[in-house]
């Protein structure tokens, strides 16, 4: 799922399955055979391939578990698997820093499409279009995109709606703000939008922030503003950061941002 490109992203190792694997391993050291038996409830009719692939993602791609003398053990602090939120933040901090993976490259392409995504009405057309336009992703197919969508939604890149993803990075942006913002800036204090974006570009490397911000990030900023988690403001004579224009939206630019203290 998060291997170097080209990687045929699989549908089977979903976030929920990978987390379930980790929580089972956390209970006690266990062999992979016993883990598969436990997760399949010893039902011979259960396809164990999804379990095997989920173990591989947790073991080899996310470093959540490790194999010691034939037994799987947890390789991270148990707090990381204590909730879907903590798990999501751990995964995000890793996968978006690996810029040579198919997952990262395709994510970056998707975010750059903006409103064009709405014309790519199914996963097959999205895969074909990307493969035609991005030489490095020419091997991409529908199954890979079907695997990508579960993790994309879980990590907060957008919302699944039928056969498409609605570009709104609200959850991804909120995670970064809640875990990283206070390390650099003060909450409840307006800072320049240019300073915020310069900082944010390093935290969201999958987003191209040169020029006008893409739709997914613009939607996230507007959503967090409406939820009073942040406040976007335009001050006279301040340098504007342009959001992706949406007709009827009251905020299409800002010069300052205030992050509210939780």
Task: Give the role of each language-model region.
Residues 1-262:
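Donor-sugar nucleotide-binding helix/loop cap in glycosyltransferases
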């Amino acid at each position: 799922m998060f291997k170097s490109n080209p990687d045929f992203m699989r549908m089977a190792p979903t976030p929920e399955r990978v987390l379930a694997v980790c929580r089972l391993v956390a209970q006690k050291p266990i062999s992979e055979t016993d883990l598969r038996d436990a997760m399949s409830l010893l039902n011979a009719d259960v396809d164990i391939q999804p379990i095997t692939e989920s173990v591989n993602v947790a073991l080899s791609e996310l470093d959540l578990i490790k194999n010691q003398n034939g037994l799987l053990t947890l390789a991270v602090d148990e707090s990381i698997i204590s909730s879907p939120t903590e798990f999501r933040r751990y995964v995000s901090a890793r996968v978006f820093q690996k810029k040579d993976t198919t997952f990262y490259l395709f994510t970056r392409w998707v975010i750059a499409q903006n409103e064009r995504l709405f014309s790519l009405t199914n996963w097959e057309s999205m895969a074909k279009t990307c493969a035609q336009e991005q030489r490095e992703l020419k091997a991409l197919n529908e199954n890979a995109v079907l695997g990508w969508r579960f993790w994309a939604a879980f990590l907060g890149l957008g919302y699944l709606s039928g056969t498409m993803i609605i570009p709104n990075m609200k959850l991804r942006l909120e995670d970064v703000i809640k875990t990283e913002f206070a390390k650099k800036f003060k909450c409840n204090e307006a800072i320049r939008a240019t300073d915020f974006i310069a900082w944010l570009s390093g935290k969201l490397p999958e987003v191209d922030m040169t020029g006008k911000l893409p739709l997914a990030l613009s939607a996230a900023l507007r959503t967090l503003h409406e939820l009073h988690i942040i406040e976007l403001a335009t001050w006279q004579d301040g340098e504007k950061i342009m959001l992706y224009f949406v007709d009827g939206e009251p905020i299409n630019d800002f010069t300052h941002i205030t992050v509210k203290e939780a």
